[in-house]
Each structure stands twice: as C-alpha cells, then as structure tokens.
Amino acid sequence: MVGPESGAPYTVPWSRCDVPGLVRLDIEPHSTPSARKIARAVEVLHDGKVVAYPTDTVYALGCAIESRRGTERIYRAKRMDEHKKLALICPDLSSASMYAHFSRTAFRVARRVFPGPYTLVLPATREVPRLLIDHSHRRRQVGIRVPDHPIALALARALGRPLLTSSAIPPGEERALADPEDVELHFGRHVDLVIHGGPTPGEPSTVLEIIDDEVAILRAGLGPTEGILDT
C-alpha cells in the first residue's frame, strides 16, 4: 500500500467489489468520451443519484446541484461535517458565471487557470441553493471548478447544470482516491454509478479565494501558484 506519509496517491490493494445495483462504466480518459456512456451517467444524475467520476486531480463524488438526496448521501458517505461545503463543477466560464460573481480580477484569474486543477472561492449568486453556501466570515461564497478532464467536462455539459462535487476521501483518511478500483471498494455502497476512467494524479486542486481584487491561496495543490497573486 502507498500511504499518505510517502506523498504518493493513497491506494489500497485491488479487490473486486460486487455491490447489487451498482453500475460500472469504463470510459477511455484520453479520447472523446462515449456519448452513449456519458448519457447513461447523466440519466443517473437526473434521477437525483450519486456518481463517482475522475477529474484532473482526484476521483470525486457528484450529484446534480438541485439533488438534496444526493447531497445528503455524499455527506454521509464521507462522514463529512455539514459545515464543509461542496464545490460546483462547471463546463465553462459562461456556466460558472451563473453561480458565482466574477470581479475583473476573478475573471482574469479564471481565464488563466481554467480549465485546470484549481478551485476558485467566489461570492455566490442566488442560483446557488442555501444548503451549498459557505457563510464563513458572513460571506455567501461558493467553490467553482472547471477541470481539465474530458469525462468531468462531458458530464457537466450533458447534465446542463453544475455537478455538486466533493473529493473521494475515505472517512478517516486525508488523501483522496486516485484509482477507480479503490473508489469502488470504499464507496461502492454509497454511490449508484462509478466511472472507471483510469488513474488520476492523486493531488488536490489549488484553492484560491478572490474577494474584490484580493487573491488569497487557501490551499496549495496540483495547480501552480507562481504569479497568481500578481494577476
């Protein structure tokens, strides 16, 4: 096993996980995703269910933005504190602007880092459900991602609205899972569909908070931060 102390992606020995009702989709990550398979995953999301899928950083658990049931299942699966908010996966900046207010600085940063391994914490619009709002420091904020991964982007585009998302971190662990077999092993009983899209880098996104013209690095991750604060 490769552990967190080594700095490598957290994995577990391979083991087949046969879970009744769990759908597994194999999608090649280095080409245009199969429209038929993406449609199958989106059908599950439209039903308010939870999908595990790859991103440009780690594997994630996601549901449609309006699915309260899906949201609650993600929190239960990870045993997350309700104060830890989920992020939104958007297919592009145009879609993201419906859910977050972009100042000139935020727009310049977003143009620079998206699509890519970054999360931007921005003021939320009224399109974001209250359940998802981070009220830290009395601000209405939301995390926005536009990942550089064909499967994640295809899901968000086909769904027609953002994916509510959280990294696939097993309860009690600090690192997110990078391999689909591990995701199936740990979360197979908590999700309805797992997309096997190959391994991911296994490092979290870089999180940037932008308030007016001020940019702060909340978490250094896979995305480089050199020059970001000078944007």
How should these model regions be labeled?
Residues 13-231:
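Active-site-adjacent structural elements in enzyme catalytic cores
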Residues 1-19:
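N-terminal amphipathic/basic-hydrophobic helices that include classical n-h-c signal peptides
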